[in-house]
Amino acid sequence: MKKVCAMASTIFNPEKPKQSFNELEAVGLHEVMFDFGLIISPEGILIDRSSEEPKFKPQKTRKSYQTIIKQFAEHGFMPSIARLPFVDVRLNPGNIYQYKELNNLILQVNIDCIRACEEMGCYDIIIQPLFAGLKPEEQWEANKAFFLTLASACQNKNTRLLLINQCQNFNGHLVRGVCSDGMDAAKWLDALNQEAGRACFGFCLDVGICNLCGQNMQSMAMALDKRIWAVILTENDGKNFAKLLPFTNAYGRSSTMDWLSAVRGLRDICFDGYLILETVDTTVAFSPLLQPYLFPVYKALLDYFAMQINIENDLKKYNQVVLFGAGNMCRNYMKCYGKKYPPLFTCDNNPKLWNTEFEGLQVKNPDELKTLPKDCGVIICNIFYREIENQLRAMGIKNIGYFNDEYMPSFYFERLKREVEPEEERSL
């Protein structure tokens, strides 16, 4: 799984990105999604054309992003995924002639940007479907012609064009737009790949758009399945178009975003593509002096989501597993994965639990882990992950996995209660 940050959230000066690159690499982030929308805008060109002294010059714009790409190359930070310029879904050009002109501009700009992507070796490209001025019954034919034209402009057989789900403006409200229905989007992709004669089309799932459209992300992911090559992780309040840091739009001590269905869906399809963190509205709300301190949080969030999505894939790596922990998390493991990936036993640091049975497992002294076969993994089922991981590494154990029960297929809603000895109670 590739962990990526959006360019606007992390590269503060695209023409002089060295400091941003150094700060990203210092926390273990090695890639950003190249965003052509920071350099060129089809709607901006349209507005510029109507002015008395147009400023847009195609050659000048091309030189601008070539200069930025050169900076990326010089610092060894070349992207493998890019996003072409998007048109604001709230845009209202005014008349049908401007819509047509806008869509023609989008095609021209996208072809130019695709060529730039291929020149820098970036072959996964996120492209916004056409929507401006199109009636629902016109959307498929217009986008079919649009995307097949873009595919024919690709000069490298490895180039993949990723459609993305959209919302639309309806009397000031953001509602479901083009490619917002998973089954319809899947049909579009299959038809486009068939017409193109090769699998050059895929999908980028923006979970923020799903939230604005009030969608179940698990159903969306399962409808698209392996067609999903990239996922944009961002948050909003379900009403306003925003790109916020996950878990920051909180109310009542919890996020208002349906992360449960997002993680479950990506886990169901064994997603292993690009995880793209996009947080530009949160980032720019901070002073430039504080923004670099967000980078470790970005890395932690990407690692966290990758871990959650990969929980079952990580279990498949080992021929046998043993659990560490004999509490609520162990119980949830046994409920959700106990039959499919049965543990040999579990262990716990509490001596009072040794040689007892919990959820059908024998509870042993952690010292027993020293005798495990080499192909056996130790899965930490306890909230004190870092402490237990250090303990295991000190014992010479290398095959360490993590289990977390926040986004399980099903839950025990009653928490496990154990009797507390008087001396233990006094120490709490």
Regions from the PLM with identified roles:
Residues 1-122, 155, 198-200, 299, ...:
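N-terminal pre-domain/capping segments
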Residues 7-11, 37-39, 84-87, 130-132, ...:
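Active-site beta-loop-alpha junctions enriched in small/polar residues
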Residues 33, 81, 126, 162, ...:
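Conserved beta-strand positions in the central sheet of alpha/beta enzyme cores
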Residues 33, 162-164, 204-206, 211, ...:
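Generic enzyme active-site microenvironment
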Residues 48-63, 97-108, 135-146, 173-184, ...:
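Alpha-helix N-cap and loop-to-helix initiation/capping positions
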Residues 74, 89-202, 212, 300, ...:
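Active-site acidic/histidine proton-transfer and metal-coordination neighborhood
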Residues 294-428:
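Hydrophobic, well-ordered beta-alpha structural blocks that scaffold small-molecule cofactor pockets
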